[in-house]
């Protein structure tokens, strides 16, 4: 690489998809019924699995937050289930959504309508269930499930189709640098998106530590704030533009809806 000097810097490298944090996943991804729409090349394989599964068990996973587009893990389940329902196969398929979180969705107002679709598709939701290992050849997925007292039990679940959402972390060159906060993400003032210790550095998008959902809609709003505040800092003016935490995550719950 090469070193480039700067007077001001905007940091927005995105988020790292940490496939390696799930034992055995990388070796079996894209075969043995294991897929992920977070890997764009595998979207056709997801569709292939959905179309060809006539019976059995379909597992869908969601890792601990933060992740990019927090609704995407559910979208895969809803759209697959809608296809099976429309083609009269759903009654022979056991659909299960394993989420490492304690709630179905982070915005409480949306949980009741989403639960209606969970019921419509006869899906089972398992909370505090984190995928930690995949044995592709055996078609077994292992989950660490935490109870209300914090005790963790590892459970093996057989599958015919497994849609995985990988854990997501800041890139190493951020998390291991002085620019990171305790979580490893790029530290910012959540209003100005300026680094609290390096006044000439700003950040936006999935890598920054602002508490909003990590979505393209959030980045679209953040870039305006960063541009205005960067110019203000350059000219010695007060940073008057403030990010309000806006984010959006469209949730597709059936074909065309």
Enumerate the predicted regions with their spans.
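FAD-binding core/adjacent interface of flavoenzyme oxidoreductases
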Residues: 1-88, 149-152, 163
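A Rossmann-like FAD-binding core segment of flavoenzymes
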Residues: 1-4, 85-183, 238
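FAD-site-proximal beta/loop scaffold in flavoenzymes
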Residues: 18-21, 26-54, 158-222
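A structural signal for isolated positions on well-ordered beta-strands in alpha/beta enzyme cores
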Residues: 57-59, 94-96, 202
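Cofactor-binding loop segments of dinucleotide-utilizing enzymes, especially the Rossmann-like FAD-
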Residues: 63, 100-102, 206
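Short, solvent-exposed loop/turn segments at secondary-structure boundaries
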Residues: 69-73, 106-109, 213-217
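Short amphipathic alpha-helical face segments that pack within enzyme cores
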Residues: 75-79, 218-225
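C-terminal, flexible cofactor-proximal segment of oxidoreductases
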Residues: 227-257
């Amino acid at each position: 690489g090469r070193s480039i000097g700067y007077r001001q810097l905007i940091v927005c490298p995105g988020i790292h998809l940490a496939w390696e944090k799930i034992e055995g996943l990388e070796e079996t991804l894209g075969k043995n019924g294991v897929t992920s729409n977070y890997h764009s090349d595998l979207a056709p394989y997801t569709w292939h699995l959905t179309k060809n599964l006539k019976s059995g068990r379909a597992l869908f996973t969601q890792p601990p937050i933060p992740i990019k587009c927090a609704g995407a893990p559910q979208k895969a389940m809803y759209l697959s289930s809608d296809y099976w329902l429309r083609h009269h196969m759903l009654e022979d398929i056991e659909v299960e959504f394993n989420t490492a979180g304690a709630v179905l969705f982070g915005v409480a107002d949306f949980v009741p309508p989403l639960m209606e679709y969970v019921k419509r598709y006869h899906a089972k939701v398992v909370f505090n269930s984190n995928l930690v290992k995949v044995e592709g050849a055996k078609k077994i997925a292992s989950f660490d499930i935490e109870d209300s007292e914090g005790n963790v039990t590892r459970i093996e679940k057989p599958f015919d189709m497994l849609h995985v959402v990988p854990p997501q972390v800041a890139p190493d060159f951020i998390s291991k640098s002085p620019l990171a906060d305790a979580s490893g993400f790029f530290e910012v003032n959540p209003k100005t998106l300026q680094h609290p210790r390096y006044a000439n550095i700003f950040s936006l998008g999935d890598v920054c530590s602002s508490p909003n959902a990590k979505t393209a809609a959030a980045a679209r709003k953040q870039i305006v704030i960063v541009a205005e505040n960067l110019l203000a800092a350059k000219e010695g003016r007060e940073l008057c533009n403030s990010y309000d935490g806006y984010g959006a995550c469209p949730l597709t719950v059936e074909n065309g809806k």
